[in-house]
């Protein structure tokens, strides 16, 4: 994928789920294109390794479902970066892959706590820093599962549908304030999150993609990096697909 030198010059970003997968890929591109990044992730060891690898300015090991931890991290990262222009919410889990009537209640709640409540906490605590400067770009990671629903993935599908609705509301609230908020709705792409799923579920999701393959993390990262840039200036409260033709709405 191409690197656009200077696209993020002077810009400062917070990336959740930044130690691996899409979050790491996006953070690396923002840094390569002139920006500064604070990484948030639950995995402290992976976070330290990624910081050393991509030269991130600041890191915070936290659970995004802990509101107090997110509030503290937002203040610490804003201080370390000097400001916050960009928020990429990429932290998430898949949960169990079973029918609704067999879904463990605690597992369902955990998926909602991380994928939806945690994303809300991150947006809630970071947006005020953007409003102070009259500029911001927010990318919340949703999924085609939030549009269509995947069988045996009710918690994940529900959480991502919530992210889409949440982001549409937020984008409208921020319209005219210099802060743009959109959601990415990818189909399944190669990333560590697939390790949480049985191969049968991965095969099912691949079969739904007209292009006949899983996406590459670099492909979704390229879309996110457009969404998080100044170039994305007249689209807000919307969704961007990287689905290989699976969804067209």
UniProtKB/Swiss-Prot annotation:
Q: What is its EC number?
A: 1.1.1.401
Q: In which pathway does it act?
A: Carbohydrate degradation; L-rhamnose degradation
Q: Which UniProt keywords apply?
A: Carbohydrate metabolism, NAD, Oxidoreductase, Rhamnose metabolism
Source superkingdom: Bacteria
Q: Provide the assembly information.
A: Homotetramer.
Role, per record:
Catalyzes the NAD(+)-dependent dehydrogenation of 2-dehydro-3-deoxy-L-rhamnonate to form 2,4-didehydro-3-deoxy-L-rhamnonate. Does not show any detectable activity in the presence of NADP(+). Catalyzes the fourth step in an alternative pathway for rhamnose utilization that does not involve phosphorylated intermediates.
Protein name in UniProt: 2-dehydro-3-deoxy-L-rhamnonate dehydrogenase (NAD(+))
